[in-house]
UniProtKB/Swiss-Prot annotation:
Keyword Secreted: no
Name of the molecule in the record: Hydroxycinnamoyltransferase
Record keywords, A-Z: Acyltransferase, Alkaloid metabolism, Transferase
Tissue: Mostly expressed in stems, and, to a lower extent, in bulbs.
Species of origin: Narcissus pseudonarcissus
Pfam families, sorted: Transferase
Species lineage: Eukaryota, Viridiplantae, Streptophyta, Embryophyta, Tracheophyta
Length: 436
């Protein structure tokens, strides 16, 4: 796919905004240090002559950046070297592009390298203030459809806050007011004074590494290359999800059940020996779990992590593996109450170097896995005036072992799993995923 860039502009807030330095909480600082990629796809309505008109979008964007002014700023460091946001109103990058390709050529919208072409590339360097915190790209396809590619610097917002901004922008483009104004002050997530963690917080401990056991025997029909990774997306229908529920005796949340299934299938596909420790990273939104809950519209990162750990043999059994995996996940999630989350903030405050806790390839690779659910997020609400997206999902998966759970845009009760695994493991994972 060849992308032709037609226009690149910097869109600034349409009115003067506060010029200040915004303090980042510890949760804002332990996230991966890149722009989180996502892509929306839209079909063109038959009567739309101004479909995704850049003028309309840029005008609405400038207005949205007034209440969401940190998004138009840049990263900076305070006198102690701590990363903060310089709310200087320098703006966000807005790109208009076109391609001779058609939306249908993307098939199931797996977050491959081709999908990444729909998001502006950010050049990182030593100067953290050199790049915009938000980059956007409108790409017009020959079929008449359009994509919106979003790259959002993770220090600025998590998924919930990022969608709050995008959906507010789309509301303004439709002539509506912002439904929930953003709450900018992040000091609500300061650690207690003095910090007093009351749990060991294994979520921030090093991930298990592979045992020195002999490597599993490989399928001779599959070419082996441990460095090669593959990215795929798999749909689970409502009927398949109901069948999965019938396989366990206890009642589990949909997330615990599906995550348990993915954890089990991944462990088998990787050929983990029974005594191999494996950790599952479950991203958990703390907004409603904290007491009192954070204000509606809190803008920033509020992602904590539940991390069930098991010996692979406990979760790979044919009869009891799914129940064991789902049970561990549900218990780990139930523990994420106000006391635990406040303890996590205190634990982070006592760490001499938060950069050592930043998640990366070393976190999720074999034998571990991360699974982030977007099923409760309003990922299909960005209607700019020409209808809702037919698909929204990650624009790439940065690490082997990282996966996303996505809701259906059709409201049919299905969901999809987008995942990155070693290529030789992906084939077996797909087979296992559908053996319900």
């Amino acid at each position: 796919m060849i992308i032709n860039i037609k226009e690149t502009t910097m869109v600034r807030p349409s009115q003067p905004t506060p010029s200040q330095r915004l303090w980042n909480s510890n949760l804002d600082l332990v996230v991966p240090r890149f722009h989180t990629p996502s892509v929306y796809f839209y079909r063109r309505p038959g009567n739309a002559s101004d479909f995704f008109d850049a003028r309309v979008l840029k005008e609405a964007l400038g207005r949205a950046l007034v209440p969401f002014y940190p998004m138009a700023g840049r990263l900076a460091r305070d006198e102690d070297g701590r990363v903060e946001i310089d709310c200087n109103g320098e703006g966000v990058r807005f790109v208009v592009a076109e391609t001779d390709s058609a939306i249908d050529e993307f098939g199931d919208f797996a977050p491959t390298m081709e999908l990444k072409k729909l998001i502006p590339k950010v050049e990182y360097g030593d100067d953290i203030s050199a790049f915009p915190l938000l980059v956007l790209q409108i790409t017009h396809f020959k079929c008449g459809g359009t994509s919106l590619g979003v790259g959002m610097q993770h220090h600025v917002a998590d998924g919930a806050s990022g969608l709050h901004f995008i959906n507010s922008w789309s509301d303004i483009a439709r002539g509506l007011d912002i439904a929930v104004p953003p709450f900018i002050d992040r000091s609500l997530l300061r650690a207690r004074d003095p910090p007093s963690p009351s749990f060991p917080h294994i979520e921030y401990q090093p991930a298990p590494s592979m045992n020195t056991s002999p490597a599993p025997i490989q399928d001779p029909t599959v070419k082996s290359d441990p460095t090669a990774t593959a990215v795929s997306i798999f749909k689970l229908t409502k009927q398949q999800l109901d069948l999965l529920k019938s396989r366990v005796s206890a009642k589990y949340s949909s997330y615990a059940l599906v995550a348990g299934h993915v954890w089990r299938c991944t462990s088998i596909a990787r050929g983990l020996p029974d005594d191999q420790r494996t950790k599952l990273y479950c991203a958990t939104d703390g907004r409603a779990r904290l007491q009192p809950p954070l204000p509606s519209g809190y803008f920033g990162n509020v992602i904590f992590t539940a991390t069930p750990v098991a010996d692979a043999g406990e979760i790979t059994g044919e009869d009891s593996g799914l129940e064991a995996a789902a049970g561990r996940i549900q218990r780990a999630l139930m523990r994420m109450d106000d006391e635990y989350l406040r303890s996590a903030l205190d634990y982070l405050e006592l760490q001499p170097d938060l950069s050592k806790l930043v998640r990366g390839a070393h976190t999720f690779r074999c034998p571990n896995i991360g699974l982030t659910s977007w099923t409760r997020l309003p990922i299909h609400d960005a209607d700019f005036g020409w209808g809702r997206p037919i698909f929204m999902g990650p624009g790439g998966i940065a690490y082997e072992g990282l996966a996303f759970m996505l809701p259906s845009s059709e409201g049919d009760g299905s969901l999809s799993i987008a995942i990155s695994l070693q290529a030789e493991h992906m084939i077996k994972f797909q087979k296992l995923l559908y053996e319900i």
